[in-house]
């Protein structure tokens, strides 16, 4: 974990967008991607020839809706038959199938049918974020802090950590998004006296509320609440449904089964939603949306607010719950801090402001970047950064859900209550329920309900070999140990024999096994190698193409009249035309083929060009050596595509 392995980065792995930061020279840098954007879409696309991640994937989604995967965060750590997954599948153009109860995404890639775990898709986004950081820092990066919604449960956290491992990262820590944002806010403000801060984090797919007390670099989380399935995408869904109905009314046609039309509509809705945060009306103009029909319409802010009113109002429930859990009154909150792109919606701000009796909300930190900013600071601390502004920082986070075991009658007995500061270790003694009972089944649950059947089973194990004894005599000591990532280990010991059994909550609930992860790491390397090969191939093709066109235009240039013999000119032009037509028929050739064609073409052109140079006939700026410079460079030709 030393800094010898290069800098440590902080990654905000978002539902819709991700962001990466690094702490160096005493401050955090949020790193822009190759398109110059400081956030990158959490999208992965598969085509016949390549895999695209980030902006490139999102930009081609309308043409390739079935094979462009997003929202992996809404799948990760969940079961296929989870109601949330089933409801989401109605909105997704890509196919989700069940593999032993776990959801997998099915796509066509390079002409084959492939299926990926949500962890693998997330790992591809993480690899992209790592590469963005490496390009900026100019060195390899392996250590990272990754953030998750505070309300993520054990399986979702563990699956996110697995995604980091598949991406080849050493995950220093999984931290909660609102806590990371609070670090960003605390660093920004430099607080010395105690302040109670409420972080209201409404992103693309998740919603969290956390209350922290910040004093002198100590960040203590008092309570957390939220909804792992509420965010900007749900507002987009409402808009999409509204316009599908409008199209039906106006044109008597149903576009809901046409994936391309729906995707173009969704892109327009996302744009309109953003516009409505600053204007009172937004227009939607989509040419030839469906069966040649243009769709021109508009939506007012008031109508949008009415459409989403239940979702907007629903954001206040977790605020009330967090206040109750923290045993605070709203008057005791000093600062209400907005995080996440969806907090730009004026109605959301107004509801929150009214709830806090007209208090000004704090908008001083960038809502899109705050989480990555805080994660970068935490990464620096965990890798031993000694900068004065971070070395005294202490983070005390909490467990979002109660953890316990099932006792007689299906009762949930909590050992670690929700909002307990982590890491934490709790031990309790239990006994047998019947005479001469040879063993006990320890079933571990998370949740707040009184009966275990209403809570989430994390895993179970048996402690056997208990010596025969009347009921109530044996003493079985159960220990719950939750680490700083919020991940749980449970052990049980029979006091009379000293016999012990333990479990790290793993495979019972859809976690990937060690073998799965190792296989996925190898797959990830393989896909990366394929991506690199594809890039090199395109570079070779572009070199050949530009060399052929350059040569042809050079010898056909008016300035060359009288300087080049007709015979030489014909030789070059014919050979270039031949190459250009070969290229048109060999768009999917190998890198070696393109390089071979370039050599053959150079054999014809080079002697003629050299002769011209010696005669001083080559006009300046006419690039005979053009291809030599570009073939080593992986610059691609123009790749422009309609976005909607």
Swiss-Prot record:
Keywords, sorted A to Z: ATP-binding, Nucleotide-binding, Stress response
Positions with biased composition (Polar residues): 627-638
Pfam families: HSP70
Disordered: annotated segments: 617-644
GO CC term (a single one): cytoplasm
GO molecular function: ATP binding; ATP-dependent protein folding chaperone
Gene3D superfamilies from the UniProt entry: 1.20.1270.10, 3.30.30.30, 3.30.420.40, Actin, Chain A, domain 4, Substrate Binding Domain Of DNAk, Chain A, domain 1
Superkingdom in the source lineage: Eukaryota
Keyword Nuclease: no
Family: Belongs to the heat shock protein 70 family.
Name of the protein: Heat shock 70 kDa protein
UniProt gene name: hsp70
